[in-house]
Amino acid sequence: MNKQQLKAYFMLMRLHRPIPILLILWPTLTALVLASHGLPDISYLVIFTIGVVVMRTVGCIINDIADVDFDKHVARTNTRPLTSGQLSIKNAIWLCISLTLVAFICVLFLNLYTILLSFVALFLAILYPFCKRFFAIPQLILGLAFNFGIFMAFSAIQNQIPVEAWIFYIATICWTIAYDTIYALADREFDLEIGIKSSAVLFGNKVFRYILLFNFLSLLLLIILGIYCDFNSFFYLGVVICSLFFVRNYFLYKKLGITNCINAFSANHWIGLIIFIIAVIQYIIKEFL
């Protein structure tokens, strides 16, 4: 394997774009904190971090295999390894299988409930790319897939999926719909031409209002989570910071339109980090005060 092929595999796995990994990782780590009622065991952190990174790459490969014919018509994607012929579909399938086995080996260190849930996670990862052909809001399926680690984190630690896990899961789904709608704006004109469905297409001229709506639905659910878990005021301070971020972004969208959508999408990982930090500090305060 030469240097050019290695680079092509690297690009296929999207390792040059770590932001989506962080968008999945922060909610998963936050779920580990919530499930542990504090800092989780280091083994869980290692297993879930590896799992997130590997399954993100698996999702990217599946997406590129499914979209190889569509990607040829989109300026942003027509140079991807499969579309440009740098790698074959066969190469991609073997890499996908290998990485899936790595992820499954990681999950074998967890309980049976979590192992069973991992098959649901894989199903969602496979389903998402094909939803763009028939489902008006494929971002909903992406939200289900991206944030399924929340359920797996709770099942690994508590061997159950309690109410707070569901609240947090739905909150992150709303957040995912919002930020991936921003991302989809970059391809909206191409999607309209080739018949690909997305929330950016569905919401039309009111897309920025819907982005703000889903952002604030996620914040409302975080407030409900805080009330349910009896969190202190510090948690709500973090929610306020997130709301200011969303309002700021809304006016940036209105001003700059789709020219800033990729940067706006990338900035969302800070929201995940803020929620993770306030969850950690929340339990530290509970522990020592």
UniProtKB/Swiss-Prot annotation:
Catalytic activity, reaction form = all-trans-octaprenyl diphosphate + 4-hydroxybenzoate = 4-hydroxy-3-(all-trans-octaprenyl)benzoate + diphosphate
Family of this protein? Belongs to the UbiA prenyltransferase family.
Q: Which InterPro entries match?
A: HB_polyprenyltransferase-like, Prenyltransferase, UbiA_prenyltransferase, UbiA_prenylTrfase_CS, UbiA_sf
Cofactor(s) this protein requires: Mg(2+)
Q: What is its EC number?
A: 2.5.1.39
Any keyword DNA damage? Answer: no
Q: Provide the membrane topology annotation.
A: Multi-pass membrane protein
Q: Which Pfam family is one of this chain's hits? A: UbiA
In what pathway does it function? Cofactor biosynthesis; ubiquinone biosynthesis
What NCBIfam families does the annotation carry? ubiA_proteo
- Give the GO biological process terms: ubiquinone biosynthetic process
Q: Name one GO cellular component term.
A: plasma membrane
Example GO molecular function: 4-hydroxybenzoate polyprenyltransferase activity
Gene source species? Francisella tularensis subsp. tularensis (strain WY96-3418)
Per its record, how is this protein called by name?
A: 4-hydroxybenzoate octaprenyltransferase
